[in-house]
């Protein structure tokens, strides 16, 4: 149920159907590997706050906290095989996030691009849209189901397929910078940047293919920090700290 106050906020919202991309690294917090459950619970609470506004939410999770296919390929592993292992890592993350969210009474469904009938539903576009219409949070796992494609590309594709109003990328920093702010204290933050400039300046916020597809389909992107509680709800209301990527 949406409260009267949240119903008024919903009417004022510009974005009523959103896709949240959560990187694997965001799930491990300050650890070097695996999951930081306090961080995952914080993310789940943020999602619950957005759902309370009446917003339909979909999520794409990465797998970099467990396995990175591109890194394995660099040391000699077959790239396609490495990418498939990375896709399996996203399923682990999706199931972990689902369990934490369900402990907070958030109705959640995991849909995987790689069929795993005993643990989650296969990805079917119409089924995913129906889940969202019923106000269930849909977590997309398995990337695109194809090697050589990043989970950023999966996020853009799923956002477009679900007719989302916007894609929000949750990271460990509060936006897009011209260099790594963790390594360069003088890094410049972009508050607004075009798709073209992201590609031209080779900014590493998302891969080129993902940005190109977002640009072609006029899908706006917001990049923000997941570390600060309540940021997700603020960003979809055009508040808080973030970088806007659009035409």
Swiss-Prot record:
It comes from the Bacteria. Its main location: cytoplasm. It is found in: Cytoplasm. It is an enzyme of class 2 (transferase). Pfam families: AA_kinase. Keywords: ATP-binding, Cytoplasm, Kinase, Nucleotide-binding, Pyrimidine biosynthesis, Transferase. GO terms for biological process: 'de novo' CTP biosynthetic process; UDP biosynthetic process. It catalyses: UMP + ATP = UDP + ADP. Gene3D superfamilies: Acetylglutamate kinase-like. Its EC number is 2.7.4.22. ATP binds at residues 21-24, 64, 68, 171-172, 177, 180. Pathway: Pyrimidine metabolism; CTP biosynthesis via de novo pathway; UDP from UMP (UMPK route): step 1/1. UMP binds at residues 63, 83, 144-151. One of its GO terms (molecular function) is UMP kinase activity. GO terms for cellular component: cytosol. Inhibited by UTP. Homohexamer. Belongs to the UMP kinase family. Catalyzes the reversible phosphorylation of UMP to UDP. This is Uridylate kinase. It comes from Rickettsia rickettsii (strain Sheila Smith).
